[in-house]
């Protein structure tokens, strides 16, 4: 399907000069969140966008629909022009051809005042981005577009792609692409981690800007070695890095913790007028973009997801100011560390989509950064190695409640920790037990690291049962379920 989609874009370019920005996302975990958020940021910045792929709807269905919509728009505009020309024959000839050109990143202070309806500390932080901080990512150069069909089609495509789609694709060349992370998954299909990672790496094509998670060694290994040319400086593949730590290169994104506050930041080149010695370290200016607490999606891992989306949308020429407001508005995807309720100062989270070890590790690290967590684990383990859970459980968990068929396997993997391990017969019992273990300020996280089919119809059904169990606790405590944000 991906090869056919790529061929379709090539045909549209040949026929109409259509050259959209294509932003592609893959990774073991976080794909849907980053895809959805990137699409929202692009739209918030005023560009027309289509989101498709593994997230749904399919690539070809969405492309077919976009072409049909564009044809209708072009026909309507042609009819309107013809009617106007009949009324005033000189009107059309006096109007210049309309062209579009790539936009550039503008400053956060360029956001209209009407966007800042609520006066908060976050608004002040966004508005404090001054002109000297207005560095721009290198943007792809697109030709001016004259054909009405090309103008009517989306300016940007945001695609969520799986390893299965990428494994056999040909001719796919996105503008920018990311592999968010790599951990064990789908090894029954790919045969090995090396083959799985190689399939993911196909997303970059030959020329795409590589948006890389610098905290994932397997992702960083996907960047090719510089091409060495005789008597010339080695040529590096264009890349922008993001991660949960401080950025170390101009243009990269990261997280800064200062005076107890966590910020999303970008590194900019220091004052270029101050020439440094040839062997001196590169000087950076850290631009604070917004407090991480202003995000509605919770956890450090989601702050990193936000940085990935911000980097991708920036590469398509989206204005920074509107995107930062878009980040604050995004509420997240269902069953992905989704807040459910706060009961007696304990917050409950539904992460039923956490069906593999990597997803649960990320959720524990994300929520555990500022609180202790009681985690509900277990289900159909898919033959995974659960040992990577031991470290985050040891660091962040107050207790573990085990359910499902592979609970004994997970117990064995966590036996070396000093965190109490409890067994529960079903989800209702697990929620009640987790609530009893949790203390004020803690989180109860249902992130099973397993598939759901041993006890439930699917992960959505598992989430529904979890939410019902939390609702029963809330009712007994006299708390409304709206307590979750």
Which residues fall in each region the model found?
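Short beta-strand segments
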Residues: 24-26, 160, 181, 213, ...
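Carbohydrate-associated surface elements
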Residues: 166
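Short, acidic/turn-prone active-site loops that include or flank metal/cofactor-
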Residues: 2-7, 54-57, 78, 182-185, ...
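Acidic, Mg2+-coordinating active-site environments of NTP-dependent enzymes
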Residues: 12, 18-20, 45, 61-156, ...
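Walker A (P-loop) phosphate-binding motif
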Residues: 8-57
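Short hydrophobic/aromatic-enriched beta-strand-loop microsegments
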Residues: 1-2, 176-182, 230-242, 372-375, ...
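General beta-strand structural signal in soluble alpha/beta enzymes
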Residues: 1-2, 25, 50-53, 157-159, ...
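ATP-dependent carboxylate-amine ligase
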Residues: 36, 43, 312-321, 325-335, ...
